[in-house]
Design a protein with these regions (language model features):
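Short, well-ordered loop/turn sites that connect or cap secondary structure elements
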Residues: 121, 127-128, 147
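Glycine- and Gly-Pro-enriched alpha-helical subdomains that act as flexible
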Residues: 131-135, 139-141
């Protein structure tokens, strides 16, 4: 499945709820979902009547597919890579669904977003691609890099003088850091302390439906 290059706000409307893909804009009146909370397309309003997107008619497969697509869109992951994460989660000990969510949460772009160093995962990916971050002292430009306990993420010394990073401390202080991460705003450094527990991950994600989707294929 190819990458969606259209307006990301349509993805929220397709899911029938905010996915917070555009950072701070999603919390303002400028959010497209606030103005048009129905599905995109010619028949979007009709499909949305009767509560949300008329999910009562959905088959089990449709619900499983929707759960998988929602997770993909939240984390900005392509289908091939998402499937690879699922296969890795199968080989790990424990619950496959939780393993999958932990893999997604441990991506570098997501960790940067969770630390408050970016307003969205998309922005975090862009910052990483431009080489503004280091992991354990080494510069990286791979947003999909999977982090582990003890890994240190820092803003590259040469990037700290840029206007965006000069004003970052004010923005970062307004964001709550999850307990599985440790952040030092003054030093512009974050550390992965452990993998997140299920309660610390987006509760609207349904990992069981995702597992069921791939299990039947």
């Amino acid at each position: 499945m190819s990458k969606s290059l259209g307006p990301v706000c349509k993805l929220c409307r397709r899911e029938g709820e905010k996915l917070f893909l555009k950072g701070d804009r999603c919390f303002t009146s400028k959010c497209s979902f606030e103005k048009r909370d129905f599905a995109p397309g010619q028949h979007g309003r009709l499909a949305s009547r009767g509560g949300g997107r008329n999910r009562g008619r959905e088959s089990d497969f449709a619900r499983q597919l929707r759960a998988k697509q929602r997770a993909r869109r939240v984390y900005g992951v392509l289908e091939r890579q998402f499937r690879r994460y699922y296969e890795v989660s199968l080989k790990r000990r424990g619950l496959t669904g939780l393993n999958l969510l932990q893999i997604l949460e441990s991506r570098l772009d997501n960790v940067i977003y969770r630390l408050g160093f970016a307003s969205s995962r998309a922005q975090a990916r862009l910052l990483v691609t431009h080489g503004h971050f280091t992991v354990n002292g080494r510069r990286t430009d791979v947003p999909s890099m999977l982090l582990k306990d003890g890994d240190e993420i820092a803003i590259r010394e040469g990037s700290r003088s840029l206007p965006y990073f000069k004003e970052l401390d004010t923005f970062a202080e307004s964001r709550t850091t999850p307990e599985w991460l440790n952040r030092d705003i003054k030093k512009m450094v974050g550390v992965v302390q452990r993998l997140p527990e299920r309660i610390e991950i987006d509760g609207s994600l349904n990992e069981q439906l995702i597992v069921e989707y791939y299990s039947r294929r």
